[in-house]
């Protein structure tokens, strides 16, 4: 399961979810302004900016089309 920790009115967050939607990548969206436990999780991972994307053992912050493309490629059937 891919999780996108996000905030409203965050340009990089919108770009991230838009790119994932365009590629048909399923994800769970968590609003950091409404979930203090999620905010603690993001901080524990070492991030101070949104979005934070967690995909299995991999995670990153910011809009990363290169990482999103790798997720898309990993989901393609062999």
Language-model regions, residue ranges each:
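C-terminal basic regulatory modules in eukaryotic proteins
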Residues: 67-78
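Short alpha-helical
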Residues: 11-12, 36-37, 66
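A short, hydrophobic beta-strand/beta-hairpin element that forms part of a small beta-sheet core
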Residues: 50-61
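ATP/adenylate-binding site constellation spanning eukaryotic-like Ser/Thr protein kinases
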Residues: 7, 47, 65
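Local sequence-structure signature of Cys/Sec-based thiol-disulfide redox active-site neighborhoods
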Residues: 1-25
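Thiol-based oxidoreductase modules, predominantly thioredoxin-like and allied folds used
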Residues: 25-38, 47-49
